[in-house]
């Protein structure tokens, strides 16, 4: 049994309420339930968290070092601004998958750049909340092949 980490950045606590035409009507609790079911079915544990504070995301990334077999991260707006989150992810030794509910490349130009994607093994954007499950399954498969 291994631990996998899913981190969510600013405003994702409003999922299902904020701009549902872009992000959908599912809530972050729905995302967590789906991901817990995937992890448990594969015999793994899951740490799932959300914060509007950059330092908390960084602290959770640091805490995952040596403990988590991989991180799925939706950094929200920090995607486009946070070198600090990138630096924390660069200190994390296991795989990272970046997830975005919307397709950031079809949105405003300032959303097209991601600091996180330079560290991520993969980037999933535009699949709605299903992107989380795709990312988690991929990390579980990577872990299974390396064990």
From Swiss-Prot:
<comment type="similarity">
    <text>Belongs to the type-II 3-dehydroquinase family.</text>
</comment>
<dbReference type="GO" id="GO:0003855">
    <property type="term" value="F:3-dehydroquinate dehydratase activity"/>
</dbReference>
<keyword id="KW-0028">Amino-acid biosynthesis</keyword>
<feature type="binding site">
    <location>
        <position position="74"/>
    </location>
    <ligand>
        <name>substrate</name>
    </ligand>
</feature>
<keyword id="KW-0057">Aromatic amino acid biosynthesis</keyword>
<protein>
    <recommendedName>
        <fullName>3-dehydroquinate dehydratase 2</fullName>
        <ecNumber>4.2.1.10</ecNumber>
    </recommendedName>
</protein>
<feature type="binding site">
    <location>
        <position position="111"/>
    </location>
    <ligand>
        <name>substrate</name>
    </ligand>
</feature>
<feature type="active site" description="Proton acceptor">
    <location>
        <position position="23"/>
    </location>
</feature>
<feature type="binding site">
    <location>
        <position position="87"/>
    </location>
    <ligand>
        <name>substrate</name>
    </ligand>
</feature>
<feature type="binding site">
    <location>
        <position position="80"/>
    </location>
    <ligand>
        <name>substrate</name>
    </ligand>
</feature>
<keyword id="KW-0456">Lyase</keyword>
<dbReference type="InterPro" id="IPR036441">
    <property type="entry name" value="DHquinase_II_sf"/>
</dbReference>
<dbReference type="GO" id="GO:0009423">
    <property type="term" value="P:chorismate biosynthetic process"/>
</dbReference>
<feature type="binding site">
    <location>
        <begin position="101"/>
        <end position="102"/>
    </location>
    <ligand>
        <name>substrate</name>
    </ligand>
</feature>
<comment type="subunit">
    <text>Homododecamer.</text>
</comment>
<feature type="site" description="Transition state stabilizer">
    <location>
        <position position="18"/>
    </location>
</feature>
<dbReference type="InterPro" id="IPR001874">
    <property type="entry name" value="DHquinase_II"/>
</dbReference>
<dbReference type="InterPro" id="IPR018509">
    <property type="entry name" value="DHquinase_II_CS"/>
</dbReference>
<comment type="pathway">
    <text>Metabolic intermediate biosynthesis; chorismate biosynthesis; chorismate from D-erythrose 4-phosphate and phosphoenolpyruvate: step 3/7.</text>
</comment>
<comment type="function">
    <text>Catalyzes a trans-dehydration via an enolate intermediate.</text>
</comment>
<dbReference type="GO" id="GO:0008652">
    <property type="term" value="P:amino acid biosynthetic process"/>
</dbReference>
<dbReference type="GO" id="GO:0009073">
    <property type="term" value="P:aromatic amino acid family biosynthetic process"/>
</dbReference>
<dbReference type="GO" id="GO:0019631">
    <property type="term" value="P:quinate catabolic process"/>
</dbReference>
<feature type="active site" description="Proton donor">
    <location>
        <position position="100"/>
    </location>
</feature>
<dbReference type="Pfam" id="PF01220">
    <property type="entry name" value="DHquinase_II"/>
</dbReference>
């Amino acid at each position: 049994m291994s631990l996998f980490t899913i981190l969510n950045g600013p405003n994702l606590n409003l999922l299902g309420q904020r701009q549902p035409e872009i992000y959908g009507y599912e809530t972050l609790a729905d995302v967590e339930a789906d991901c817990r079911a995937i992890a448990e079915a594969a015999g793994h544990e899951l740490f799932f968290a959300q914060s509007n504070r950059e330092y908390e995301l960084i602290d959770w990334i640091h805490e995952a070092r040596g403990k988590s077999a991989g991180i799925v991260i939706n950094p929200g707006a920090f995607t486009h601004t946070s070198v600090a989150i990138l630096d924390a992810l660069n200190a994390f030794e296991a795989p990272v998958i970046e997830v975005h509910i919307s397709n950031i490349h079809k949105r405003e130009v300032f959303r097209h750049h991601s600091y996180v994607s330079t560290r991520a093994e993969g980037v999933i954007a535009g699949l709605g909340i299903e992107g989380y499950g795709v990312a988690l399954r991929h990390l579980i498969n990577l872990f299974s092949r390396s064990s």
